[in-house]
Amino acid sequence: RDGRLDVVFCEARENAVVWLRQQSPGVFVETRLAEKMSAPVHVQAADMDGDGDLDLVVGAMGVVFPNNDRIGTVFVLENDGQQRFTPRAVLENTTRVTDVRPADLNGDGRLDLVLGQFGYDQGEISWLERTGPWTFRRHVLLELSGAINVGVADFNGDGRPDVAALISQQWEEVHLLLNDGGGRFTPSRIWGSTNEDYGSSGLVVCDLNGDGRPDLLHSNGDGFGPAATPGPRPWHGVQWQENLGGGRFRHHRIGNLPGAYSPIAVDVDRDGAMDVVAVAAYADWNNANRRVVSLMWFRNDGKQTFEPRVLARQPKDLITLAAGDFDGTGRVSLVTGGFYIYPPYDALSRVTLWQPTAP
């Protein structure tokens, strides 16, 4: 906590969690915080033990590629205050974990954990209720395979945190679980596609139109799918679920982006309107002129009409995206991470910091 933004990310193929500490402006030093986690895919900072230090919550799949075994794990990397981290497995031998979000779901003042568990044939949305310093009780909220992301916010304005979930596989749906209090939740499906190759790939909570109600951004760009040939699809892109209040949502298509992943809402041009930025994990790199897109900005005109603007055409196969003020100027920078499975193996970048060129 030196006032400079750092980067923490998962190396799923190397079973590691990595910290890029910004030692001085624009200079980062790499430290591996854990190297024996099986396919970690999500990490988030939170003070899980209430000691004033940021710990790290990690969801690990066991293996990234399809598997029905109960090989998922949830870890907390406990920070001792000197930036030394001790791994604690708080859930083991479970269906593959793709997302984990800290939140106090039952209002007892302690952080619980909300999980997206992809599994394969079997998966769940669940939450871990805090019962002690490092002990949790698991509750299943929804039994569906293919969970990609979960999000936590008060979606219906009753003062209690609710849960949203993006489900892929054959379902291709967005679900809402309204918190009724006392650990009880009412599930509903707020949107779904009839296309089993839709490719749901990422979900984030945001207030895109600035009305004070939390909305949902989600992408469809997964190029694995049931089709024989992996790669981008013409229907890939980014969607907005506008929160109308009372648990009701209206679906909007933001725009097309083959291979779309990891959408975020951020005011790129500082005009007071939230824009949308997303990366592309799959593109047609066999195309002769390689006029593909790897980083796309959907500029908001202030009336929730979005104009696509290409920010970059390489590096290829970007799968994750975050934003922040990395240089202390108040301007938004972007951070992307790559995941490389398919050739060609050029135009690669492990982690990239994108800094604004205009004042």
Located regions from the model:
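Beta-propeller-forming repeat regions
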Residues: 1-359
